[in-house]
Amino acid sequence: MSDFERTEFELPPGVGHSQNEDLNPQQTAGDSDIDTSLRPKSLDEFIGQPKVRTQLDLVLGGARSRGVAPDHVLLAGPPGLGKTTMAMIIAQELGSSLRMTSGPALERAGDLAAMLSNLMEGDVLFIDEIHRMARPAEEMLYMAMEDFRIDVIVGKGPGATSIPIEIAPFTLVGATTRAGMLTGPLRDRFGFTAQMEFYDTADLTRVVTRAAGILGVDITGDAAAEIASRSRGTPRIANRLLRRVRDFADVNADGKITVEVARAALLVFDVDESGLDRLDRAVIEALVKGHGGGPVGVNTLALAVGEEPSTVEEVCEPYLVRAGMVSRTPRGRVATAAAWRHIGLEPPEGTIGL
């Protein structure tokens, strides 16, 4: 056993069972500068998503060979998998300028009209969280996507007139974490939809190794795999955990990350071997120890761990369900055999997954 495995480190102070923000797949302000340096610049550099990369290579290559703008592209999938990066790569592969905005920023049709009227021929317009666009802006987008023109209403009341405005041919790339919330008319106007999938440990290990090389971090292969295995299948989380482990290694190990250093660092930052944090484990313990494994309603669970129901439902549950530790049933949440064993208890007969 190494010195790092024998040493006990004090866990960072937390309030209640609050989530470790390093495990939040959503982008945070602290990601921006580092993410920019780590983003791949081409489809060849992009790690993972082999099916999407192959499909996009054909879609973009076909458009280039014909000398036309490619079909509009919808990138769907959970946060943190590289949808924004893929939009940047699409523009790069086409040799086009990229204009970026988000659904929530397009509150009025006029907001979208101003952006569309400033596009140059061949530009790529990226709309993140496109499912959150206001309806007036979305309806204007229909005509822009199909006919490359928009109708602008001038005036009010009976005297209002509609003025058609031609816009330059462009390619729209939309990103959504909730494809089911897209309206049918909007979804149907995308010529190609790419479904981004969670990463396996092998691809995430490559992500960590590549990021370490760019950041100048001295890391062993098994340490990269250790970080990858706790990253919830999400590159954004893997890159964050690498930075936390690097901080630990700089202070405690002369900057060299071995697997022992990685494990010790992740213990300090409260990320266990399954990628669970304090809040995830609190939910499991509330299910198992407080309610015999369930079923339990989300409001009761939230009360037990001192969090809002939306936090339990939107932050904890997706990964716990995907990890096979929680099952959602019509009667409530149920702990599986894997959840019982994760906290060191033997599941009773009849437990899901036994």
Curated annotation (Swiss-Prot):
Positions contributing to ATP binding: L38, R39, G80, K83, T84, T85, E146, D147, F148, R189, Y199, R236
GO cellular component terms, semicolon-separated: cytoplasm; Holliday junction resolvase complex
Record key words, sorted: ATP-binding, Cytoplasm, DNA damage, DNA recombination, DNA repair, DNA-binding, Hydrolase, Nucleotide-binding
InterPro entries: AAA+_ATPase, AAA_lid_4, DNA_helicase_Holl-junc_RuvB, P-loop_NTPase, RuvB-like_N, RuvB_C, WH-like_DNA-bd_sf, WH_DNA-bd_sf
Domain of life of the source: Bacteria
Region (Head domain (RuvB-H)): 273-354
UniProt xrefs under Pfam families: AAA_lid_4, RuvB_C, RuvB_N
Residue segments, region Disordered: 1-38
Renumbered residue ranges of the record's region Small ATPAse domain (RuvB-S): 200-270
Protein EC: 3.6.4.-
Broad class of the protein's primary localization: cytoplasm
Feature: compositional bias, Polar residues: 17-30
Gene Ontology molecular function: ATP binding; ATP hydrolysis activity; four-way junction DNA binding; four-way junction helicase activity
Residues the record lists as binding Mg(2+): T84
GO biological process, one term: DNA recombination
Catalytic reactions of this protein: ATP + H2O = ADP + phosphate + H(+)
EC class name: hydrolase
Compartments, record wording: Cytoplasm
Positions of DNA binding: R328, R333
Swiss-Prot/TrEMBL domain comment: Has 3 domains, the large (RuvB-L) and small ATPase (RuvB-S) domains and the C-terminal head (RuvB-H) domain. The head domain binds DNA, while the ATPase domains jointly bind ATP, ADP or are empty depending on the state of the subunit in the translocation cycle. During a single DNA translocation step the structure of each domain remains the same, but their relative positions change.
Record's function text: The RuvA-RuvB-RuvC complex processes Holliday junction (HJ) DNA during genetic recombination and DNA repair, while the RuvA-RuvB complex plays an important role in the rescue of blocked DNA replication forks via replication fork reversal (RFR). RuvA specifically binds to HJ cruciform DNA, conferring on it an open structure. The RuvB hexamer acts as an ATP-dependent pump, pulling dsDNA into and through the RuvAB complex. RuvB forms 2 homohexamers on either side of HJ DNA bound by 1 or 2 RuvA tetramers; 4 subunits per hexamer contact DNA at a time.
Subunit structure: Homohexamer. Forms an RuvA(8)-RuvB(12)-Holliday junction (HJ) complex. HJ DNA is sandwiched between 2 RuvA tetramers; dsDNA enters through RuvA and exits via RuvB. An RuvB hexamer assembles on each DNA strand where it exits the tetramer. Each RuvB hexamer is contacted by two RuvA subunits (via domain III) on 2 adjacent RuvB subunits; this complex drives branch migration. In the full resolvosome a probable DNA-RuvA(4)-RuvB(12)-RuvC(2) complex forms which resolves the HJ.
UniProt record similarity statement: Belongs to the RuvB family.
Name of the protein described by the UniProt record: Holliday junction branch migration complex subunit RuvB
Record organism: Corynebacterium jeikeium (strain K411)
Lineage: Bacteria, Bacillati, Actinomycetota, Actinomycetes, Mycobacteriales
